[in-house]
């Protein structure tokens, strides 16, 4: 498959970090460093930072995303935010199914599908996260599990809508631990995801979809990971809070 036809996307996932004032300061440091990026650059920020982030990135090439959304348009869901609300705020991207949402807040493959559906209906681009726990990798069921997660998350998604889907492979054992899948391990699973897309939508769709790696990518390992044939970008956690490191990853994606 021709990697050149795909769009590289580097997305920062800030998690539960930064006040609005701190978000402005961080984005003011990041935007000049990535202004010549040859890839798409996204910052997925906490809900309370969205307004400040949109203001700080106005007129730049950095797009703003959210870290989650509810599956309902509105209703008695105290503390939740709908995809339509995010769209109305000016957000362009949203993450669904992050391993921390699955681990700590009860997200399942079905609720990830529901959130993804709602986000697509609202007109957002969705970064859908899939990945295995350490015990699942040790059991040798990584490929089967990730393929299943991908199929369920994309339930009801049309080929046209697939153009607003990014799949992020995040081995859960490499999230926030400092451990990283080898470049070969990352590429193998990203290839499984692409093969799953091919089985669902055909070869052209599989060639076109962007697949990110999301397991502790940093300035030191980004170039090797992003050089892999099926890795088209990164979902960046800790390094996205460090302007120079995030910019180095963006530069690696531009070259990769």
Task: List each language-model region with its residue ranges.
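Active-site loop-to-helix "anion-binding N-cap" substructures in soluble metabolic enzymes
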Residues: 1-256
